A protein has these predicted regions:
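Short solvent-exposed coil/turn linkers within tandem alpha-helical repeat scaffolds
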Residues: 65-69, 109-121, 161-166
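Short, charged, amphipathic alpha-helical segments
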Residues: 119-124, 148-152
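Short coil/linker segments at helix-helix boundaries
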Residues: 16, 20-26, 30-31, 58-100, ...
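N-terminal Sec/ER secretory leader and immediately downstream segment
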Residues: 1-48
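Short, charge-rich amphipathic alpha-helical segments embedded
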Residues: 2-8, 114-119, 123
Length: 166
């Protein structure tokens, strides 16, 4: 039932020129409500397609009061970051400074829990964030217009990161 919707996700939105916003069609709103009732949601994945994913705070809401500090911290960091997709279509969807904050959060987690059961997942996410932060992405280069001049927002994010996390 969701195959067409996921393959053609962007076609389930109408563009409203008056407020310059994309509004979901009634069919999508109905499906969104059904998914939300069981802890899932749709997310735009790029290239007109969508995916179904757990709601960002799903695990945190259910388990945080009942689990170890290691799992609690993992769930809380994940919930805080999963609300806003970091990368899509080879481009950074968040500010470089926010990307630095995400890196610091996961580095702090690994320092606090060096033998974490979640180490592989954390390290994978951390490596992707570090790559985007230090090397850039196809559609979010670090340098201005192919020059050797570092983009102003990247330079500021790097300086702020070094200042806050020496």
């Amino acid at each position: 039932e969701d195959t067409d919707l996921l393959d053609n996700y962007s076609s389930y939105y109408d563009y409203n020129e008056k407020n310059e916003a994309y509004n979901p069609k009634p069919e999508l709103v109905t499906r969104q409500k059904e998914l939300a009732a069981v802890g899932f949601e749709y997310q735009y994945a790029g290239e007109g397609m969508g995916v179904i994913k757990l709601q960002a705070d799903y695990y945190a809401t259910l388990f945080v009061p009942y689990v170890s500090p290691e799992y609690r911290d993992y769930a809380l960091i994940h919930a805080a970051q999963a609300n806003e997709q970091a990368v899509m279509d080879g481009g950074l969807m968040i500010e470089y400074q926010e990307l630095g904050e995400r890196i610091a959060a996961w580095e702090g987690y690994l320092r606090s829990y060096p033998d974490s059961k979640w180490q592989q997942q954390v390290q994978c996410r951390l490596s992707r964030y570090q790559f985007a932060f230090l090397v850039g992405l196809d559609n979010s280069p670090l340098f201005e217009d192919g020059s050797k001049k570092l983009s102003q927002d990247v330079a500021q994010a790097w300086l702020e990161f070094v200042r806050r996390y020496p």
